[in-house]
């Protein structure tokens, strides 16, 4: 996270329309999709935008998945999906190394943009990277690292975007259940914390809150360019294949069940019954339990 934050105030200078000396047609944009990881906060995957300025060595990744561990009630806000997240950026080399270490595969899709749309996207990235805009209120279904990528791409396009039609729409709960089939405690925890809003039907566009589905659905979407419908982006290309080297963890359920019971107990005591547990200490208890739980399971 420290490496990512180093670039927060540098990127507007690197890629703003004013500071860009290269012709816009020498800039390429890509959507990156990272497979789910072995931690609670990475189990659903990740999305980012890559910007390459050919002939300059500039190769930067914009990432809306950063958060501050010092946020009050961090663990509860995180689990509930109501945490303040932030945008940052790093070099493509740094970004890829992180996923290589975590043994998580990465896919890339080139975004199909006119020169005018490229300028739109540059300006939107520049706007996002301003100090007053780097924080946003995370929402699990409607405003996360994947939906931010989707929205900034859609809003940069000058034509209308059409998604493929899906006859049997799933609920948000059914979609996340698919991600948690081998993690019963997390499945139960999500049901406990997300409540009734998770039972709403999700459109194909809505499904983009999950990075792997965003890769599929936005990759199948089309945009109207001068009366002609064209793909929004290319088919996914696997640029980091870690599927055969990912570590597998044994199925150990007793400890997770005990720890999850403690997690529920802390949440009930602190937030339902209103009994404070040493203030910020309860945050660290919650987050520690989440991390320990995730480390016990095969994701």
Feature-to-residue mapping (PLM):
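Generic ordered-secondary-structure signal
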Residues: 13, 18, 139, 197, ...
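Alpha-helical transmembrane segments forming the membrane-embedded cores
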Residues: 244-299
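Bacterial Sec-dependent N-terminal signal peptides
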Residues: 1-22
């Amino acid at each position: 996270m420290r490496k990512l934050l180093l670039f927060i105030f540098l990127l507007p200078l690197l890629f703003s329309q004013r500071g860009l000396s290269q012709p816009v047609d020498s800039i390429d944009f890509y959507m990156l999709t990272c497979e789910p990881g072995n931690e609670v906060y990475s189990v659903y995957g990740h999305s980012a935008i890559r910007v390459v300025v050919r002939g300059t060595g500039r190769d930067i990744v914009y990432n809306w998945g950063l958060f501050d561990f010092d946020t009050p009630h961090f663990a509860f806000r995180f689990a509930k999906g109501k945490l303040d997240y932030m945008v940052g950026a790093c070099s493509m080399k740094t970004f890829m190394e992180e996923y290589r270490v975590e043994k998580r595969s990465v896919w890339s899709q080139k975004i199909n943009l006119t020169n005018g749309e490229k300028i739109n996207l540059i300006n939107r990235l520049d706007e996002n990277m301003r100090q007053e805009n780097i924080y946003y209120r995370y929402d699990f279904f409607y405003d996360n690292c994947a939906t931010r990528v989707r929205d900034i791409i859609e809003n940069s396009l000058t034509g209308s975007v059409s998604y493929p039609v899906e006859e049997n729409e799933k609920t948000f709960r059914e979609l996340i259940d698919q991600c948690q089939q081998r993690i019963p405690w997390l499945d139960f925890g999500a049901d406990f914390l997300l409540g009734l809003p998770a039972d709403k039907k999700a459109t194909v566009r809505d499904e983009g809150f999950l990075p792997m589905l965003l890769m599929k659905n936005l990759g199948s979407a089309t945009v109207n360019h001068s009366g002609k419908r064209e793909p929004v982006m290319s088919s996914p290309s696997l640029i980091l294949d870690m599927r055969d080297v990912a570590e597998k963890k044994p199925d150990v359920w007793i400890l997770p069940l005990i720890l999850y019971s403690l997690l529920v107990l802390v949440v009930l005591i602190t937030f339902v019954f209103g009994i404070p547990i040493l203030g910020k200490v309860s945050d660290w208890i919650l987050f520690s339990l989440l991390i320990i739980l995730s480390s016990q399971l095969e994701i």
